[in-house]
């Protein structure tokens, strides 16, 4: 029977971000760590058949686009050889004990402008997988609670969006595995270094890495899986995931200790 061991290696928080609890009902029976106010057990948990834990994948799924605006309040910004009109919203920020603060929000095809001044000709727009459409992670968490084996657990993560994690799991059938879960956009690796020009069309997202192509290992012949926020794929992996994985020394140390163990 495979053994699963994981730790959150989070900073010491008061109050702790995790809440250990046991939820039992006719539909499921799960023990794990949840976030107060959040349903289910996205990071650490087990039911009678499957157990899981996570580390941070470090995937890059947010981009910044430099936008060129007309120097007026018309809201037009340049894209290729066209001028497109941004959505403009007038918001009011309520300040306790102070005056209201008016805020004009500009949204281009790449997302809301978070820096700069469009009325003076430029701004930086923020594009993020979790705001590209309705969030579907609650559906995945529900299916996670009901999983009877590793295959069902993997399938429950098909619509997981954010955050991207290394999900490690075992089941009572003797299977164990690792899945990189979450939506990672397909686009130029240049998007991962600096804000990119929004007007050229060269840095647009081309969908997401297919779920079947996300890094995954089930019952690897080595007989073990180690993940410590380190790079999960080799240089031959065809998609860009990140340029900012954690150095691999922790994973190397854990692997060395595992290989030094002798079976009783």
Give the ranges of each region predicted by the language model.
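Mature extracytoplasmic enzyme cores
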Residues: 1-264
